[in-house]
């Protein structure tokens, strides 16, 4: 082994434990954002036939939960916590069985079928004091005019609306409530 290779191996050996420790310290605290669903079996769209299986329902709810947990953490300051409880979810689009039997399980997205997400939330500071809380019915009448990415994401319109809500109700107050 030549001297350069030996030096490189030594440096990498010294850096690797530090990088691993740094990666561990970046891990987000999952308790900072709590997302729950109040009686999801009664939600407007979760009870629809096309996602009537528990697996289908859980997949949609899990995707919404994961989205909020990952996005909200980027807006929260150290020690702040966010609790979100969904009370209804009505996805963009609807079913049009009058189109024929082959369309019974196809969601048709038109501007008359707006997404609607109803939730309660509470943002608390590191000291435990409430910074912001409330009930919101999130909708966007112009959801079809947005450029929602990625276009292949079946929940792109709902995620856009949730992202707007997080920026307005969480990001601003989170910064103010140091």
Predicted features and spans:
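Bacterial N-terminal signal peptides that target proteins for export
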Residues: 1-8
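N-terminal post-signal-peptidase region of extra-cytosolic proteins
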Residues: 62-70, 101-108
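Surface-exposed short loop/turn segments
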Residues: 86-125
